[in-house]
């Protein structure tokens, strides 16, 4: 009986919680550390830019970062991290692009259904228009030579003034990682 239960005891996995801010170095692929470094650099630079420093709290529409790499990267996570930091800074105002359809449906419901108290319903035509569009992309270059792999990521963000089409702010963050496979191993 003891011999039958021994394999189950030795093969069990141990789960641990980790610090989300700790450097993650399991692979050279895009990871949480990269996401945090990108968001920190981009948000810090944008908040220090003349567009934001003018003091009028610009209204920005944040579009999703485009993935131009050869791997799956959750660009929504990048966009969400940047959006959250910008909102929490209080220095800018953001237009909610990803829920615009739901907002329009709710406004229509309040205006036309007859179920919403006229004293509390919100009026159509009061949405705030964005003055700027924050857009960007992430690209990568992967090189292999023997047992070595080099991976380079670059993310670019641009803040475009919607009325003029002028780029009012731009920033990039570069990340390079290297990995050397062991001679023997998996």
Predicted regions and their residues:
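Sec-dependent bacterial lipoprotein signal peptides
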Residues: 1-9
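Short, solvent-exposed, polar/charged sequence segments at loop or secondary-structure edges
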Residues: 70, 76-81, 89, 95-145
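Amphipathic beta-strand/beta-sheet edge segments enriched in Tyr/Trp
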Residues: 12-15, 131-183
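Short, surface-exposed secondary-structure junctions/capping segments
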Residues: 114, 181-186
């Amino acid at each position: 009986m003891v011999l039958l239960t021994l394999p189950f005891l030795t093969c069990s996995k141990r789960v641990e919680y980790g610090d989300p801010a700790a450097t993650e170095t399991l692979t050279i692929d895009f990871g949480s550390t990269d996401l945090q470094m990108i968001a920190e650099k981009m948000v810090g630079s944008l908040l220090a830019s003349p567009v934001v420093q003018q003091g009028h709290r610009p209204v920005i529409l944040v579009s999703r970062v485009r993935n131009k790499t050869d791997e799956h990267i959750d660009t929504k996570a990048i966009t969400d991290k940047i959006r959250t930091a910008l909102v929490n800074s209080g220095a800018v105002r953001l237009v909610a692009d990803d829920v615009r359809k739901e907002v329009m449906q709710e406004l229509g419901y309040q205006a036309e259904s007859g179920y919403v108290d006229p004293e509390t319903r919100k009026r159509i035509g009061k949405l705030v228009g964005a003055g700027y569009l924050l857009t960007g992309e992430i690209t990568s270059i992967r090189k292999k030579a023997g047992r070595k792999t080099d991976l380079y990521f670059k993310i670019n963000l641009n803040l475009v003034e919607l009325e003029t089409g002028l780029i009012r702010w731009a920033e990039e963050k570069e990340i390079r990682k290297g990995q050397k496979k062991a001679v023997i191993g998996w």
